[in-house]
């Protein structure tokens, strides 16, 4: 059997989200608007929770951490994706690709654990670091075009000429354990939540509680659903073009929706937001009067 020649790859070329040139600028404007909205929503939520003493509870501490993780992991992907719409050749260095994959996996793992109300930060960091190290210790051959808009595992594995069996087993084992354990915690939590809601005597209270829980379950379903669709299916069934579209949901859409779904439907957060806006308006009026 002929031995495959392993060459030193110093950079990769990222494939655009869509090949149509006429959609480049509309997509750039759309994703830039989403990213700005995501940054304002998540960072604003953190600021409101940190400055309002009424929100100094474990639940809002959890929400502020979730908002921080949402902002971080979309910031790992979106700025580079926006740049790809503007440049003719979307080049990313080998080290930058490794850093992007490692950072993204770290924040994505933290997101899964936070959604299950778990905070194993050191565990998520070590798993993501080992995961990325396994990927970039593989031997990459002549081709360096990644069929994705960011550095992701499955497209990178298509480029390697090494045996990926051990790596794929690691991906399925880690993803399976993490997803299933997180989903089990979420499921058990909702069994108790629904049981408590059904014991409520007020019909209005039940409707309000189901509305809040339904919003959270929508976010959980979209997030876990896209991850399961992408990472827990056999490689023979993988379509990278379909994966690219699915990954937009959890890299761009979910971080934008999280502050709306998890917080702005909450009465206490709404009141804190109104109070912050009122203070800001009063401060601006005072500054104008001083002038």
Task: Walk through the language-model features, giving the residues of each.
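Transmembrane helical core of 7TM receptor-like proteins
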Residues: 1-291
């Amino acid at each position: 059997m002929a031995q495959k020649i392993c060459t030193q790859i110093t950079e990769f070329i990222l494939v655009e989200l869509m090949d149509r040139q006429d959609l480049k600028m509309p997509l750039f404007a759309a994703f830039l608007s989403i990213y700005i909205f995501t940054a304002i929503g998540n960072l604003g939520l953190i600021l409101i929770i940190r400055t309002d003493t009424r929100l100094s509870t474990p639940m809002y501490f959890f929400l502020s951490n979730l908002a921080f993780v949402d902002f971080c992991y979309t910031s790992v992907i979106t700025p580079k994706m926006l740049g790809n719409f503007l440049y003719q050749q979307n080049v990313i260095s080998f080290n930058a690709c490794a850093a992007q994959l490692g950072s993204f996996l770290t924040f994505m793992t933290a997101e899964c654990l936070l959604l299950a109300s778990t905070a194993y930060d050191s565990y998520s960091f070590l798993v993501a670091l080992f995961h990325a190290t396994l990927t970039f210790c593989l031997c990459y051959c002549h081709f360096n075009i990644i069929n994705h808009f960011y550095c992701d595992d499955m497209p990178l594995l298509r480029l390697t000429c090494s045996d990926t069996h051990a790596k794929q087993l690691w991906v399925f084992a880690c993803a399976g354990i993490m997803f299933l354990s997180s989903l089990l915690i979420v499921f058990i939590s909702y069994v108790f939540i629904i049981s408590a809601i059904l014991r409520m005597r007020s019909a209005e209270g039940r409707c309000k509680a189901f509305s809040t829980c339904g919003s959270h379950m929508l976010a959980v379903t979209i997030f876990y659903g896209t991850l399961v669709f992408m990472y827990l299916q056999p490689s023979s069934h993988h379509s990278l073009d379909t994966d690219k579209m699915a990954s937009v949901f959890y890299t761009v859409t979910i971080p934008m929706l999280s502050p709306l779904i998890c917080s702005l439907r909450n009465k206490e957060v709404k009141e804190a937001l109104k109070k912050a806006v009122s203070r800001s308006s009063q401060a601006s009026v005072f500054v104008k009067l001083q002038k």
